[in-house]
Amino acid sequence: MNDDYSKTKSRRLTPWTGRCDSTPLESYIDLCTGRDYDNRHPAILASGEAAFLNSYELSSCRFCGSGTIVKDGFSETGIRRYRCRECGRRFTVITNTIFDSRKLPVSEWVCFLLDLFGYSSFSLTSKVNRNAVSTTKYWVRKLFLLLVGVQDGILLGGKVWVDETFIKVRKGDVEKRPDGKEYRGLSRNQMCIGIACDRENAVFVFEGYGKTSKKKTLDAFSSHIKEGSHLIHDKEEGHSTLVSKLGLTEEAYDSRKLKGIPDNDNPLDRVNELCNLLQQFLSSHSGFNRDDIQDYLNLFSVMVNPPHNKYEKVKKILELGLEKPVLVRFRD
């Protein structure tokens, strides 16, 4: 086996890359692998991204925010460059964004995002897109920063459902009783995720550890539910505060009595479905750092909220990526 192959994690190389004694079949496999890799990772100049990026006209400096900017030629990759008359710095449309200092074209984000929207683990996404695991982790970190606050403007109305789902802390973080046994039920070892939704949109909020409460529920959803809406819930005591504080009408059901009822007849089916999808999503990232739970919930909200077409979701995120100043260096 080629020593270079055994020492690298490059998804471009095969055991026969660079060998002169390969059989015709081995050489053919290596050729196909290289061709596929090159198709997935075009050079920035060949990707056609310059025309797309140059369609965005900047009106202010990417550094100081001044509006006194002038066009100043093009970068070596064909992207329009600007110069600020106020601070004197030069920049492009991708300066101080998630695409700044990139080595791969923006087009690679399309496949990356489509895979994430399909409930793929980050490891699988890395393999499918033939990227190094470190690249995928770096991009995920950028995406999480980009999506901070993405749920802030969601306002639910009409019929609104609310419920909670739970995930366990990681094995190494499990707290035990003095006798060595784990705490039972909705203990401090369970992370509480609040879910509120109407017919079209949904909000996902990490509420803390253990059982929800009136304060947790109010803090999570008071800014996301229109006053006068109709709340449908499972008689959880913490939900009552939303009814009283926001002037809501309500329907309350005993969830134990709804078990076994067909989904179409279950009045809590809308929120139950989201609970199940969220559990499926989190299971695909089973070893994730629980400190990042709200970041994962922000990503999931993009996955299940409008627009429902995946390509329109990609467009939305790429536009946000060019508009929102988020800068992360690989070694940060």
Regions found by a protein language model. Give the residues of each.
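Residue-level recognition of single "structural anchor" positions
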Residues: M1-D332
